[in-house]
Structure formats: structure tokens, C-alpha cells
């Protein structure tokens, strides 16, 4: 499963296995967790593609951009992410995926533990200090 997805306006998305006698069972696992049962069943049972705008409306992708702007949008997205604390992003991703399938109570327990851990990071102290001082971030972890 990918964390983020950006597509050009020309992109289409499909689970076409049924059209050739092979049900897309394994792709359906990740797709269903993003777009829900009825929408994934539409893709699985019909094999018909959806356009990029529909994929975005359904929650399958984050952004739709003109084809000529795709590389620039991807670069902008990645530049924003790599400007963040790598240690914090790593902890956040691990925590997010660890809690996402749990009950609300269990998810809050996992997230609270991660927040407490995160606050002990050098990057957290440096980031808060830089924010309060209105200075650019300079992550100790690199």
C-alpha cells in the first residue's frame, strides 16, 4: 500500500482481472482499505477503469494534475516530506500503520505512547524551538 498517490489527468485505474478470468484478490486487499467495499466490488466485478478524478473522489489518490505538471508536483510533494524530521516521519508512519486497524481505544493507546516517545526526540525539541523562534528547521537527526 502506498502512502500518497499523485496521478495525471490522463491516468485510469482498474482491477481488470475478471475480464480475463483472474479475480484481483490480492490487489483488492489494499484498494478496499482505501475506497471501501462497494467501490472496490464495482472495480472487481466489472473490470472497468475509472478516471483519475473519480479515483481522487473515491480516496484512491491524493492529487490529480495535468500530465505536463506531474513531475513538478511529485517533486514539490517529495521536497515537502524530506524537509521534515526523518526520525519523526519514520515513527509517525510506523505508529499510523500499527494503529489503523485497531479499536479506537487501542489506537489511542498506541498513538499516545508514540506521542510521548516523539516528544523525547531531539528533533522535537529543536523543531519546537525553531518554530517559537521563527527560525528555519535544522533537524539534529539530519
Region spans (language model):
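CoA-thioester-processing core
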Residues: 1-44, 58, 73, 77
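Well-ordered beta-strand positions
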Residues: 4, 42, 46-48, 54, ...
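C-terminal long alpha-helix characteristic of the crotonase
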Residues: 6-11, 61-109, 116-117, 122, ...
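Mobile beta-alpha loop/short-helix "lid" or hinge segments that flank ligand
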Residues: 20-23, 48-53, 87, 93-94
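Hydrophobic alpha-helical segments typical of transmembrane helices
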Residues: 27-30, 39, 91, 111-115, ...
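Terminal peptide-recognition signature
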Residues: 55, 92, 131
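Interdomain hinge/lid region at the active-site interface
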Residues: 123-124, 130
